[in-house]
Amino acid sequence: MTSLYDFSVLNQDSQETSLDAYRGKVLLVVNTATGCGLTPQYQGLQELYDRYQEQGFEILDFPCNQFMGQAPGSAEEINSFCSLHYQTTFPRFAKIKVNGKEADPLYVWLKDQKSGPLGKRIEWNFAKFLIGRDGQVFERFSSKTDPQQIEEAIQKLL
């Protein structure tokens, strides 16, 4: 695979969706959880989305239950939680695994492009990959990086 656009993932209805639909946009790919101490980052993510979506920015939300089971529940329950507590409107996909033998191919590729605090492994919920309009990883941000701290990098790519 040569770019993010070469991948397909499952949407929340378990239908295969090509990421080529996001060609030409600046993307932030995030593994998320609804029961984590970092869950309030959803607010900052939504603020970035509101500010830059019209300029070609999208956030791709991938719930992940690999870190202490902090993303329990069905897709519907996760959507309800995010809508009720954080009014999120960015695209959310089916739950995936980001580490180990069952890691989604998208995340295998992302981790191969940029290492993080633990090398290639995703360290926790809310690790972020910023993707340029060319479908390539521009930067990787740790779970602890507040969404507002990456705003300048987003602006550069827009």
Set out the residue ranges of the language-model regions.
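Chalcogenol-based redox active-site neighborhoods
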Residues: 1-158
